Design a protein with these regions (language model features):
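Phosphate-binding site recognition
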Residues: 1-152, 157
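Cytosolic catalytic cores of cyclic-nucleotide second-messenger enzymes
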Residues: 160
């Protein structure tokens, strides 16, 4: 695997005490979802992924009260997967498609049982639909395509 700066950032984020949700933004098709899946596979025993474009009905997880207990009950019912406290990564992909999920992050982070990563490529498009931004509950990370310099460095070391 081509080592990416984003992966190193994910590891650092995971090891941060009292971590916030990690919001990864960037252009489409640059590997955001791939790197998050790879990271989850190597660092967590449980991984739950919700893609709000391919599964628009997942938005119903956030119907009703936006408190952590209700959301986690709905999430477990929707995914039919167990949640292991302290060893589960919950990944909301294309979060711009579910403004309620973006609002709810603050309650989930406050609950502190699980780690959360959000990603999206068009986050600014629906910004007016988010009722309350999770200011202070998200760490933002901007991911970029692999640069020629980065690719060339790996090539000269025989890592490709």
């Amino acid at each position: 695997m081509l080592q990416r700066k984003a992966y190193e950032h994910l590891v650092k984020w995971k090891n941060t005490p009292d971590k916030k949700a990690l919001l990864i933004t960037g252009a489409r098709q640059i590997g955001k979802t791939y790197i998050i899946r790879k990271f989850a596979e190597e660092n967590y025993s449980n991984f739950i992924e919700i893609n709000f474009i391919t599964n628009p009905d997942a938005a119903k997880i956030f119907n009703g009260d936006l408190n952590a207990e209700t959301i986690l009950i709905n999430l477990t019912a929707y995914t039919q997967k167990p949640l292991v406290k302290g060893d589960t990564l919950i990944f909301f992909d294309e979060i711009q498609e579910c403004p309620s999920a973006r609002t709810a992050i603050k309650f989930l982070v406050d609950d502190g049982q699980f780690d959360y990563i959000e990603s999206g490529s068009l986050l600014g498009v629906r910004y007016k639909e988010v009722k309350s931004y999770p200011v202070g509950y998200e760490e933002n990370y901007r991911m970029y395509p692999v640069s020629y310099t980065h690719l060339r460095a790996h090539e000269t070391r025989g890592n490709l």
